[in-house]
Each structure stands twice: as C-alpha cells, then as structure tokens.
C-alpha cells in the first residue's frame, strides 16, 4: 500500500476531524490498547474500535466526523492521508 501524507501529524488529546480527512492513519503509541470513537459533527456516535498498542490502523470517515480516544489521546497519533493499493 502506498500512502500520501496530506497534513501535519496530530493527536487525539481532544476530539478531531483530523484536518477534515476522509482517510486517517492512526498509531496508538500508548502502552495499552485504547478505545477510539467516531462521531458525527452533531456529536452522535457512529461506532468505536479498540486500537492495540503499537499498532497502525487506517480508518475511513466523512470529512466532518470526529475521532476521540477514551483516554490518553495525546498518545494517539493521527494524520490525514490518501492511499493506493499500487505496489
């Protein structure tokens, strides 16, 4: 997979739309697994997942949707990307 970085890396110390990203690269740098929640711009929960520590996850979302970490959000690194399956 090829990725194109489209913005500066940030974290989830507070709710973020990650520069209005539709695709996000997320790295949980904390020592434990963390719960990540996706919400609409109106703050309605769409869903959540557990991000294992030390793992990278690629998430698709709507531009105005936000991501939050249940705790230790400063340890969760996020960046807006584009991707391709080309090798």
Language model features with spans:
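Surface-exposed ligand/attachment interfaces on beta-rich extracellular proteins
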Residues: 1-20
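Serine/proline-rich low-complexity intrinsically disordered segments, especially terminal tails, linkers
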Residues: 15-16, 33, 50, 86
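Asparagine-centered strand-capping/turn motif at beta-strand->loop junctions
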Residues: 20, 24-32, 71
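Short, surface-exposed beta-strand/strand-loop-strand elements in extracellular ectodomains
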Residues: 27-47
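Intrinsically disordered, low-complexity Pro/Gly/Ser/Thr-rich segments with frequent PxxP/GP/PP motifs
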Residues: 40-73
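Exposed low-complexity, polar/acidic, P/S/T/G-rich flexible segments that act as propeptides
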Residues: 74-87
């Amino acid at each position: 997979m090829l990725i194109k970085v489209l913005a500066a890396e940030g974290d989830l110390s507070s709710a973020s739309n990650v520069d209005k990203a539709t695709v996000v690269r997320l790295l949980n740098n904390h020592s434990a697994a963390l719960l990540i929640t996706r919400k609409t711009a109106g703050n309605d929960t769409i869903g959540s997942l557990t991000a294992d520590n030390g793992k990278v996850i690629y998430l698709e979302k709507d531009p105005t949707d936000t991501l939050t970490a249940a705790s230790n959000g400063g340890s969760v690194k996020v960046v807006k990307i584009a991707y391709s399956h080309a090798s």
